[in-house]
Every structure is written in structure tokens, then in C-alpha cells.
């Protein structure tokens, strides 16, 4: 699936998403046109191999793209968001620490569903410099891995 757009921020977010979320059964080429505005209403319209998005930011553009690619019974939709933020919290404590690729894939899926935030409940599953036995013998995220996840989340529009 080849996406094309002139929006630099959307290109960056889409390249991150496409690394982890495969897009099947779609046309070989899809040109995405984005019109940003400040009011709450947002919409998408598909005409042949072109997709027209109207939204207030890249996060909403990803969500509209996700809807446009999965709602095969319609060619257009208008939405008024009821929430400014939508978040999920994952419990990664008690030896249920996801690998980085799994977390990145999950963040991409959340972005395509319109989520703006993701929190990790970690208890002692993170590295604490100077305390080598903190979370001893448990899966945990190093400081570098936490930074990598945070940077990736920002690239797909999670705060």
C-alpha cells in the first residue's frame, strides 16, 4: 500500500505506523489530502484513489485514516468529537512487560483508533539507576527503552 501526501507531519506519523501495522486489501496507491482547521468538526471523504481529510491535527488525521480504511460500507463520514483526549492504561507490572516492538505496534493501533494518550502502570518493572536489585529478576524497561517508547509515542501523536 502506498500512501502519498504533501503533509510532512502526516508523512512522519504514517511511516512510523506502517512499520508496525500492515495495511491489507487496499488500493496500490492512495493520495491523502489534509485540510487543517480549528473548529471541532472533522470529516473524511474517499473518491477513487484519493482521500480527503478535514481535521485539527495529525492525531485526528490518523484516526480519520483508520476509519476510512476500515469502514468499507461508506465513502464519507462527518464526526464531532465528544472528547478532547482519549487514553488507555496498560498494566505492565507483575512480569507482563511487553517487548518494545509489541508496545510500538499497540501504540500505532491506538493512534489509528483515535487514542491520544497511553499510560503504563509499571510498579517495579523499570530500571532505577543506583539500585540494581529494584525489580530484581523481573522483566523491566531500561531508561533508554522508556525514552525510546516515549519518543515513538510522540511520533504517532500520543502525549
Name what the model sees in each region.
Residues 19, 47-159:
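Feature activates predominantly on carbohydrate-active enzymes
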Residues 1-77:
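Acidic, contiguous N-terminal accessory segments
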